[in-house]
């Protein structure tokens, strides 16, 4: 039988047909598709493969039980083993601690440190991110303190010439670029991982810096606040920020070791508690401003 296709009687009929098809496909321009959801925290009772990216803090330097880099360390008192132990109730937790003492988050900051005559141990982008296992379901990233110290030293030695603030702002932008590279690389290696980014506190407010000159602390503060904001920009589906910058308890001198730079057991326990809350479903976001951002005068 020959099928005869009859022409539509009017343009109105054609428009009605197009509208019907569009609505049937859910393509109405007034109803945009929801943004894709990223990986969620590991479900309660589900096994966890936890990978930590960090510097000496990841190894628990300053605590009573310091972990040897890359070695199993179930009894450590740093935030990585403390968090892992707290998550093990009723499930298996596998830990890959990639923390390297002295490491920089940013390759650019590491290069600046070398230019100041220091030997370095690496950076997160080149020495840690490439080793994130594909089966990882939870990642924490905490770094930036070493970057602040190195760039502060360079600025004090005249790296910025007559435009110190311009120099610092350029380093903040470079840090942000490297942070984005890091997170993109982690996501590329572990597509199903829930990522917690811990922003840097105001290093000028930590005990080790309280005896420094006002100009030095102003540089440290400018970098710290800038670095924290770059970390905050990494928030995305499946990536949340733990706001250490605006956490008043994080600056309590009783939570630091004798060097005033590394946390002690109490400081690491506080960080692990905050991380555990996020893993267990607590919401977390960074503040746009807080008193901890202005402990000294701005540049």
Protein language model features and the residues they cover:
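Solvent-exposed loop/turn segments at secondary-structure junctions
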Residues: 56-60, 100-106, 144-150, 201-206, ...
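C-terminal motif of bacterial Sec signal peptides marking the signal peptidase cleavage site
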Residues: 19-22
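Catalytic His-Asp segment of secreted/periplasmic serine-dependent ester chemistry enzymes
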Residues: 200-299
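Short amphipathic alpha-helices and their capping/turn segments at secondary-structure boundaries
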Residues: 37-49, 82, 115-137, 181-192
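Bacterial signal peptide processing site
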Residues: 24-27
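Bacterial N-terminal signal peptides that target proteins for export
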Residues: 2-12
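Serine-esterase "nucleophile elbow" of acetyl-processing enzymes
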Residues: 31-101, 139
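Oxyanion-hole/transition-state-stabilizing segment in secreted/luminal serine hydrolases
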Residues: 61-63, 107-173
